[in-house]
Amino acid sequence: MLPFASCLPGSLLLWALLLLLLGAASPQDSEEPDSYTECTDGYEWDADSQHCRDVNECLTIPEACKGEMKCINHYGGYLCLPRSAAVINDLHGEGPPPPVPPAQHPNPCPPGYEPDEQESCVDVDECAQALHDCRPSQDCHNLPGSYQCTCPDGYRKVGPECVDIDECRYRYCQHRCVNLPGSFRCQCEPGFQLGPNNRSCVDVNECDMGAPCEQRCFNSYGTFLCRCNQGYELHRDGFSCSDIDECSYSSYLCQYRCVNEPGRFSCHCPQGYQLLATRLCQDIDECETGAHQCSEAQTCVNFHGGYRCVDTNRCVEPYVQVSDNRCFCPVSNPLCREQPSSIVHRYMSITSERSVPADVFQIQATSVYPGAYNAFQIRAGNTQGDFYIRQINNVSAMLVLARPVTGPREYVLDLEMVTMNSLMSYRASSVLRLTVFVGAYTF
């Protein structure tokens, strides 16, 4: 109460109270806003209508409802309902009113049936008409007068829902198993393929399927191996083959020359030789085979790697020919007094680089006189001392190669046998003229 209210008349007191109330409110507090643009949750301001309008959260919020639920918008919010749920709009709300169902007549048919045009009772397909309460994860199967909710193949019922069966837990697959929604798939390791039952794995014959082997392919369990023909070796890539250069491995494969060829090698011999099965080279005896060009007045002499045609009569005055390769100097001829009584022509062949000392030719006296002594010597042709004589006994001696010689080369050695008899003061000599052919090779 005002302190002075008791002193004022009643009318003045009412007037004073009105003035006090009007003065207590400031002009700013009595002003109202020109417009309102803020809306409550679930609404937004519409500038055209100058009113708040509902926000459709089902369109503006991504994945507003999870799983198999469907989003239903309503004023100021939204609902997440099962997809089988139906929503009846309020007749007093916005939008057209729901249609008025026609007048229904009593159904004379048992549950799950309905009359047709002929007034016969036919089954109601609840699955096709969505008159069932099966879960979205279930399959609806129509039955006479009813329906059944079952889980699809590969699913099992857990509570009201159907969940995927992990078939891989039961090891249906031989190798690898991949679980899929409602099913599974078997896979095989490399080198295998699924069998007819789509579960077991069978070996793949890569060799029949164009394996990248260059020469030979061998199939094995789960894989394959490449191999090469004889004379080839497998490359590092495991598929291609490279020729083996056998000639580079050893210098003893062939006696003369080794020639590498694709997948093999061959041995060759020089002219005048033939190749043996042992890969050795053997001299061809042209004189024996007739592969020579000597005339009838000549004698064919074979040596290592070739032959020589020599005259049949090689006797030079004062010698006369008495037989093949033998010349005799008559005693009646004064020119023969200082000459050997006979000269016999012989021929032989040796190889190059022969090991020394080597016995190469044996000299043998054809006749022996009582009390005679025979001495053997090299009369001519040994200017470099490549040979020497080793006397064995009174009637024989050996021609010895003193040092290695390299061909092709030819020696003509006069090997003399001197016969002496001191009691009869007798001295005579004969010569064996030996032609030695040295071949060009060590074989």
From Swiss-Prot:
Protein species of origin? Cricetulus griseus
Instruction: Provide the family line.
Output: Belongs to the fibulin family.
Q: List the disulfide bonds.
A: C58-C121, C65-C80, C71-C109, C127-C140, C134-C149, C151-C162, C168-C177, C173-C186, C188-C201, C207-C217, C213-C226, C228-C241, C247-C258, C254-C267, C269-C281, C287-C300, C294-C309, C315-C327
Q: Which GO terms describe its cellular component?
A: basement membrane; elastic fiber; extracellular matrix; extracellular region; microfibril
Q: Name one Pfam family in it.
A: cEGF
Q: Name one GO biological process term.
A: vascular associated smooth muscle cell development
Lineage runs: Eukaryota, Metazoa, Chordata, Craniata, Vertebrata
Listed InterPro entries: cEGF, EGF-like_Ca-bd_dom, EGF-like_CS, EGF-like_dom, EGF-type_Asp/Asn_hydroxyl_site, EGF_Ca-bd_CS, Fibulin_C, Growth_fac_rcpt_cys_sf
Where in or outside the cell is it found?
Answer: Secreted, Extracellular space, Extracellular matrix; Secreted, Extracellular space, Extracellular matrix, Basement membrane
SUPFAM superfamilies to which the protein is assigned, alphabetical: Growth factor receptor domain
- Keyword terms, alphabetized: Basement membrane, Calcium, Disulfide bond, EGF-like domain, Extracellular matrix, Glycoprotein, Repeat, Secreted, Signal
Q: What is this protein called?
A: EGF-containing fibulin-like extracellular matrix protein 2
Name the glycosylated positions.
Answer: N198, N394
Q: Which residues does this entry assign to the site Cleavage?
A: V87, I88, D90, L91, H92, G93
